[in-house]
Amino acid sequence: MFSKQDQIQGYDDALLAAMNAEEQRQEDHIELIASENYTSKRVMQAQGSGLTNKYAEGYPGKRYYGGCEHVDKVEALAIERAKQLFGADYANVQPHSGSSANSAVYLALLQAGDTILGMSLAHGGHLTHGAKVSSSGKLYNAVQYGIDTKTGLIDYDEVERLAVECKPKMIVAGFSAYSKTLDFPRFRQIADKVGALLFVDMAHVAGLVAAGLYPNPLPYADVVTTTTHKTLRGPRGGLILAKANEEIEKKLNAAVFPGAQGGPLMHVIAGKAVCFKEALEPGFKAYQQQVIDNAQAMASVFIKRGYDVVSGGTDNHLFLVSLIRQGLTGKDADAALGRAHITVNKNAVPNDPQSPFVTSGLRIGTPAVTTRGFKVTQCVTLAGWICDILDNLGDADVEANVAQQVSALCADFPVYR
């Protein structure tokens, strides 16, 4: 029998030490990984609730187990809030992750061997958009488009040429490292020209879309997916959205359950419901605008300090810094910044001479630092510190000096006050 007073402390101190160390790292380090953010304590409360005990295979009102009358209400709240937030007619809140959501879309709307046209991972796309190492690149005939290496922008004429040439069943629009605004009307035009479905993965910019600061793909896409963390600041999970289409809705539901998953994670769905409610609050737009302002301010500093920012700047929450001209690797830069308590991720850049495990670039994003309360002033200072480390890569004194300043800044802007 369990007690309400049961705690990890005193029972599994080795695990607790690792958990506490990670929480302290989050407080003491500046987080600039574009896909990371901090959830509210409300989201954490939902995820740590008794809902974790409930199995609920199926959908609200159509479960395979009894005792689901309360979790039905939880899922219904999440669905309705997601639809309201994005102007969707359909929402499935059960995918365990963004990759799970993408896999369900492919399972629902494609047959093995069908052709998909997606953005190359090497040019800013995502693994699930047809990369050879992903199931999306193994189960389907994946053709890849990229960016114009001179402008750093997607070449839509090239996308159209490839579409006409390969006649894809589906075109995938989305990215993990592209800093400019996607042209959804143009993607729709290309898809219609070749009779393809248009699938948009807006995982990185969903928060900006919800705030009205980035174009909403719903009017143009046959189906849209997103994660619920990143710019949405919710729990780690996935979401599928669409406009009204009974045939597609049935296929999507069947692909998620029983096609790809069994029981949904009801405690995570509750966390999603909380984050959707938070995103509907008036202050959410101001937060997202600050995310963009901070990213643009940081990118400007890198450009002024002589670093190449792919695409020449950013319209969203992230940007990619190429270190090719400096002869540096992303791996070494990532490690040096980590020693100064600044967390980024190494990232491939167009025409990268290095392997994906070394790379010649850094991806930098501002959602997490903005959640901490950083404004443009702090972000400009932070970008300067990063450039100082890159200018003097491997200099322990520079790293120590920056680490000391990072410590003071983190103390002024705690994650949880």
UniProtKB/Swiss-Prot annotation:
Listed EC numbers: 2.1.2.1
Entry keyword set: Amino-acid biosynthesis, Cytoplasm, One-carbon metabolism, Pyridoxal phosphate, Transferase
Domain of life where this protein originates: Bacteria
Annotated compartments: Cytoplasm
Annotated organism of origin: Pseudomonas fluorescens (strain Pf0-1)
Enzyme class: transferase
Record-listed (6S)-5,6,7,8-tetrahydrofolate binding positions: L121, G125, H126, L127, S355, P356, F357
Residue numbers of N6-(pyridoxal phosphate)lysine PTMs: K230
Name of the protein: Serine hydroxymethyltransferase 3
NCBIfam families: PRK00011.1
Pathway(s): One-carbon metabolism; tetrahydrofolate interconversion; Amino-acid biosynthesis; glycine biosynthesis; glycine from L-serine: step 1/1
Subunit structure: Homodimer.
Swiss-Prot/TrEMBL catalytic activity: (6R)-5,10-methylene-5,6,7,8-tetrahydrofolate + glycine + H2O = (6S)-5,6,7,8-tetrahydrofolate + L-serine
GO cellular component entries: cytosol
Chain positions of site Plays an important role in substrate specificity: H229
Pfam families: SHMT
Family: Belongs to the SHMT family.
Function: Catalyzes the reversible interconversion of serine and glycine with tetrahydrofolate (THF) serving as the one-carbon carrier. This reaction serves as the major source of one-carbon groups required for the biosynthesis of purines, thymidylate, methionine, and other important biomolecules. Also exhibits THF-independent aldolase activity toward beta-hydroxyamino acids, producing glycine and aldehydes, via a retro-aldol mechanism.
GO MF: glycine hydroxymethyltransferase activity; pyridoxal phosphate binding
GO biological process: glycine biosynthetic process from serine; tetrahydrofolate interconversion
